[in-house]
Amino acid sequence: MSQLTDGFGRSFPYLRLSLTEACNFRCSYCLPDGYQADGRPRFLQVDEIARLVRAFAALGMSKIRLTGGEPSLRKDLDEIIATVAAVPGIRKVAITTNGTLLPRRLPGWHRAGLTALNVSMDSLQRERFKTITGHDRLPEIEQGLALAQALGLPAIKLNAVLLRGLNDDELPQWMDYLRGRPFSVRFIELMRTGDNEAYFQRHHLRADVVIEQLLAAGWHERPRAADAGPAREFGHPDHRGSIGIIAPYSRDFCKGCNRLRVTAKGDLRLCLFGEFGVPLRPLLQRDEDHDALLARITTQLGLKAAGHGLHQGQTGLTPHLASIGG
């Protein structure tokens, strides 16, 4: 099956689908004042999600990542996962979560067809974690990760946003943590959004600083697979785990773009920091609109730019990452 390809030769096997803008954390870099609902939002329903995923699968997509906000706040998440996993052509169903509900809900997600797990974990130190996220929930997350291992989930990744002055001295602790754990930790460079300019100026840390420390500690960059995304992967012979660096301010970051995004309200976003969204929801109400939906997606892909405008301070439509799921 052919894959979606843009005018710059990039293929897109991967969709990030936001299920909600709501979040139960108050992360200092994203929603420091907590989630503020705009009226009564109506996020995509299961039948709309089914039509959406069938369309992207028909266009060659094989991986769906469910994001938020915090997707575990959806009470119908088990049904959503099962619906996505049942679509022919979808081989990988992943979720990105803050992990607080893993002990209670992960078994149900696993039974429904979840194949990969990403957990946001910005610090290994309990007090720091509380400072960054606004919640003292690190023990539940650690319990959930142990459960994920026990269930045999084949892909477990941890996401940590690099924050100068808050967690930038924890790399040695992370290395020790990965010595006996087969996780992949992703260090993500803080990105400027529409509402965090002052915070960005205080806490942005160049990913190069971490890469230099990794190389000095004997870690080696792994060859990039042909279908790899923008992360640079590092490994060490004495560690079971690996480290990925996601550096959106690096020169070649956008060359490795392999994903599209759909918001919780059904807008196609060609770039995390794009200037416009394409409404797909009107074509998600009837099965008979399947061909029109395919045409809208493929036509709009031709408008995808070569790269973002972060270096010029252009953050596009993204007020904060909870609005689109990163």
UniProtKB/Swiss-Prot annotation:
Q: Which Gene3D superfamilies match?
A: Aldolase class I
Q: Recite the UniProt cofactor note for this protein.
A: Binds 2 [4Fe-4S] clusters. Binds 1 [4Fe-4S] cluster coordinated with 3 cysteines and an exchangeable S-adenosyl-L-methionine and 1 [4Fe-4S] cluster coordinated with 3 cysteines and the GTP-derived substrate.
Uppermost EC category: lyase
> Which positions bind GTP?
16, 65, 96, 157, 259-261
Say which domain of life the source belongs to: Bacteria
Q: Which residue numbers delimit the Radical SAM core domain? A: 7-232
Annotated binding of [4Fe-4S] cluster 2, by residue: 254, 257, 271
Pfam families per the UniProt record, alphabetical = Mob_synth_C, Radical_SAM
Protein family: Belongs to the radical SAM superfamily. MoaA family.
Which NCBIfam families does the protein's record reference? moaA
Q: What is this protein called?
A: GTP 3',8-cyclase
Organism (species): Stenotrophomonas maltophilia (strain K279a)
**Gene that this polypeptide is encoded by:** moaA
